[in-house]
């Protein structure tokens, strides 16, 4: 039986969710129960017990805490989500607490998916997940992604 991971919420229901670092095997089972088949880990160290759930594919992108993802990491994240969603599979993304790095990636995906301006995507992620996108550099990464993709 799955147990909801800390700070779990859908940003695009059934397609893309954010969460804090999963720490228990039951957290991974919850993700599987929700249809999540891909977990993007943005922490420098891998999530504990991630090998406890063979039905979940782990994608590692090491980003230091309070830092923004690189343009290449953002592009890789968008590709993972697009490819998984095209197969009907949902994606979860996490950092330590599910706010800074996670929120940044989620906002970038909204820029691409909903054709939102960077400020609107940041505002929407903060509405859905209060406290998200913690630093100026993380905000700047969303604006730079918007500039690259418009």
UniProtKB/Swiss-Prot annotation:
User: What's a single GO BP term from this record?
Assistant: dephosphorylation
Catalysed reactions listed for this entry: O-phospho-L-tyrosyl-[protein] + H2O = L-tyrosyl-[protein] + phosphate; O-phospho-L-seryl-[protein] + H2O = L-seryl-[protein] + phosphate; O-phospho-L-threonyl-[protein] + H2O = L-threonyl-[protein] + phosphate
Q: What is its main location?
A: cytoplasm
Would you say which domain of life the source belongs to?
Eukaryota
Q: Name one GO molecular function term.
A: protein tyrosine phosphatase activity
InterPro entries for the chain: Prot-tyrosine_phosphatase-like, PTP, PTP-SAK, Tyr_Pase_AS, Tyr_Pase_cat, Tyr_Pase_dom, TYR_PHOSPHATASE_DUAL_dom
Q: Nucleus: present as a keyword of the record? A: yes
Q: Which gene encodes it?
A: Dusp23
Report the function annotation for this chain.
Answer: Protein phosphatase that mediates dephosphorylation of proteins phosphorylated on Tyr and Ser/Thr residues. In vitro, it can dephosphorylate p44-ERK1 (MAPK3) but not p54 SAPK-beta (MAPK10) in vitro. Able to enhance activation of JNK and p38 (MAPK14).
Q: Which GO terms describe its cellular component?
A: cytosol; nucleoplasm
- Does the record bear Acetylation in its keywords? no
Q: What SUPFAM superfamilies does UniProt report for this protein, alphabetically?
A: (Phosphotyrosine protein) phosphatases II
Intracellular or extracellular location(s): Cytoplasm, Cytosol; Nucleus
Disulfide cysteine pairs (residue numbers): none
Q: In which tissues is it expressed?
A: Widely expressed.
Task: State the protein's name.
Answer: Dual specificity protein phosphatase 23
Location of the Tyrosine-protein phosphatase domain: 7-150
Q: Where are the active-site residues found?
A: 95 (phosphocysteine intermediate)
